């Protein structure tokens, strides 16, 4: 079954508006886990498919192991033996011919840039004083001259976190992005992540003040979530849900697209709504319970502080960030229990399910 896309008109208009202008900023697309960031970018790519001027380079770092600088390049490029290219460059400048080659082979949507191995050898041998970013800059310049608009999208940016030399790579990568946007205005750059602490880290480290902007892709608000339920139930179940059923779903999973989708799929499999929701909640409660147990075993003092912090959410879904001491809030954000919105300065549970689990578990506290 092909997933149908729902709503997000405001975010889509904003991003299409940005793409229509000259590149001038790096954009961080952020929001809680499973809020629909990737799905939104896929929809954007889909809407651009008939517009011949865009060349989109989309890299999803999910599920790839990045332990070195060169792993990152392996993701950006697909290196292939290419005999035609060999013929082309017999006597000519490999780099110049390479640019022509990439222009020719760049499609609307590329997972990675295809590089003939002869060209890769030249680019990757830094001794020749030519590094990958400088080469790509030349490629993008040439594309611009021809009226093409390259777009780079990096999904799951936080995967760069595990890298030993990540500081270095992040500096190089974002210097490159600043050059492509603020300085040369030749390429749109978008980075997606649900890890707002990492986005903040990148922002500070790469000195992006005044050079980057943020677009929030949040879970749906209540009104939109109920409409999303109608949209999915008609499409997947072939029937409408009652108002009571929708309210019940919302009370358990809120407006998180992935959770709402999961509920509807389980309904299709013939399960009872109440059982589905109770099961999902139980799972979340168990996760949180074991997390708290581990913390308690390790450090009782920290455990007490965490319980105090989580207690604030018994009465509120969203609070001001500084209501929880920095080390505790960062710990809970890292553990994906809370979502920090560094722009608004707010904190909330990663999902309604997590919120409900907090309320259930801390009932006696
Ligand atoms: N606009 C939408 N229309 C239809 N379904 C959606 C939409 N947004 C999200 N979904 C559903 O929610 C799921 C999770 O969305 P997605 O993977 O895009 O989230 P994400 O924010 O990129 O996640 P992560 O936090 O892992 O980066 C999708 O697989 C899809 O089922």
From Swiss-Prot:
Residues engaged in binding ATP: 31-38
InterPro entries xref list: AAA+_ATPase, ATPase_dom, MJ1010-like_2nd, P-loop_NTPase, WH-like_DNA-bd_sf
Keyword ATP-binding assigned: yes
Keywords per UniProt: ATP-binding, Nucleotide-binding
GO terms, molecular function: ATP binding; ATP hydrolysis activity
Gene3D superfamilies for this protein: P-loop containing nucleotide triphosphate hydrolases, Winged helix-like DNA-binding domain superfamily/Winged helix DNA-binding domain
ATP-binding found in the keyword field: yes
Pfam families per record: ATPase_2, MJ1010-like_2nd
Signal peptide annotation: none
Annotated family: Belongs to the archaeal ATPase family.
Record's protein name: Uncharacterized ATP-binding protein MJ0075
Organism listed in the record: Methanocaldococcus jannaschii (strain ATCC 43067 / DSM 2661 / JAL-1 / JCM 10045 / NBRC 100440) (Methanococcus jannaschii)
């Amino acid at each position: 079954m092909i997933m149908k896309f729902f709503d997000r008109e405001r975010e889509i208009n904003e991003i299409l508006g940005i793409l229509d202008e000259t590149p001038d900023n790096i954009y961080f697309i952020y929001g809680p886990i499973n809020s629909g960031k990737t799905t939104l970018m896929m929809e954007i790519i889909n809407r651009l498919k008939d517009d011949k001027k865009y060349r989109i380079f989309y890299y999803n770092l999910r599920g790839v192991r990045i332990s070195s600088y060169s792993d990152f390049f392996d993701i950006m490029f697909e290196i292939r033996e290419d005999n035609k290219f060999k013929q082309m460059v017999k006597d000519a400048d490999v780099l110049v011919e390479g640019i022509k080659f990439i222009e020719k082979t760049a499609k609307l949507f590329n997972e990675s840039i295809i590089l003939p191995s002869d060209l890769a050898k030249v680019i990757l041998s830094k001794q020749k004083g030519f590094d990958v970013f400088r080469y790509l800059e030349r490629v993008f310049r040439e594309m611009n001259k021809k009226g093409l608009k390259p777009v780079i999208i990096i999904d799951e940016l936080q995967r760069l976190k595990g890298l030993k030399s990540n500081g270095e790579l992040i500096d190089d990568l974002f210097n490159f992005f600043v050059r492509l946007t603020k300085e040369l205005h030749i390429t749109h750059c978008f980075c997606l992540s649900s890890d707002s602490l990492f986005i903040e880290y990148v922002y500070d480290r790469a000195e992006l003040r005044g050079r980057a902007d943020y677009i929030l892709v949040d879970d749906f608000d209540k009104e939109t979530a109920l409409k999303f339920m109608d949209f999915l139930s008609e499409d997947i179940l072939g029937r409408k849900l009652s108002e009571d059923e929708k309210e019940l779903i919302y009370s358990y999973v809120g407006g998180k697209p992935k959770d709402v989708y999961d509920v509807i799929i389980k309904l299709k499999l013939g399960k009872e709504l109440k059982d589905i929701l109770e099961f999902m909640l139980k799972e979340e409660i168990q996760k949180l319970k074991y997390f708290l147990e581990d913390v308690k075993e390790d450090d009782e003092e920290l455990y007490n502080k965490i319980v105090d912090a989580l207690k604030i959410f018994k009465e509120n879904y969203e609070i001001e960030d500084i209501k929880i001491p920095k080390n505790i809030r960062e710990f809970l954000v890292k553990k994906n229990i809370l979502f920090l919105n560094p722009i608004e300065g707010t904190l909330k549970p990663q999902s309604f399910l997590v919120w409900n689990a907090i309320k259930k578990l801390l009932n006696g506290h």
